[in-house]
Design a protein with these regions (language model features):
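Alpha-helical transmembrane segments of multi-pass membrane proteins
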Residues: 1-164
Length: 164
């Protein structure tokens, strides 16, 4: 969605990688701090509510807002766009896997090692990374992709809330 405005230069890809790595760290920090300061029960209640927040925001779309900034300060514009369109959902999703592992571990004293959830999460991420450019991107227009994302995210949010 940003490539038509900025192109596919290495600086665009590097900036996006930087943003997503930083957002991943923010998600992990939120998980760690929340569990440490709030405990499992309060953190589960907070996250079960927070996971719904991205669905209340407007759909993800890159507009020409700030197009003048894009030509003068493309990196600043790109960081603004990714932060405002995918920042919150990404941070929430990044924090969900470690939280689910902790919830699983503390839900039952007889619970076994929760790290199989981490492996399942990585396998799902890899499958999505492979499927998107081969199936979704060429076959579905952007608006349908966004609709599928919102429906899928709603299902994930409901399942996470049920776990919390």
């Amino acid at each position: 969605m940003v490539l038509p405005v900025l192109g596919g230069s290495p600086s665009v890809w590097t900036t996006c990688m930087l943003f997503f790595q930083a957002a991943l760290l923010v998600g992990y920090a939120y998980s760690h701090a929340g569990l440490r300061w709030l405990g499992v029960r309060q953190q589960a209640a907070l996250h079960s509510a927070l996971v719904w927040l991205p669905l209340l925001l407007p759909p993800m779309a890159v507009t020409n807002v700030g197009a003048a900034i894009a030509t003068r300060e493309p990196i600043t514009w790109l960081l603004m766009i990714v932060a405002t369109t995918v920042g919150l959902p990404f941070v929430v999703l990044a924090s969900t896997a470690p939280l689910l592992q902790r919830w699983f571990l503390t839900a039952d004293r007889g619970s076994s090692d929760p790290y199989w959830l981490y492996a399942a999460s990585n396998a799902g991420s890899l499958a999505a990374l492979l499927a998107f450019p081969m199936l979704f991107e060429p076959l579905l227009p952007s608006q349908e992709q966004a609709a599928i994302w919102r429906i899928s995210y709603g299902i994930v949010a409901a399942r996470v809330a049920m776990c919390g």
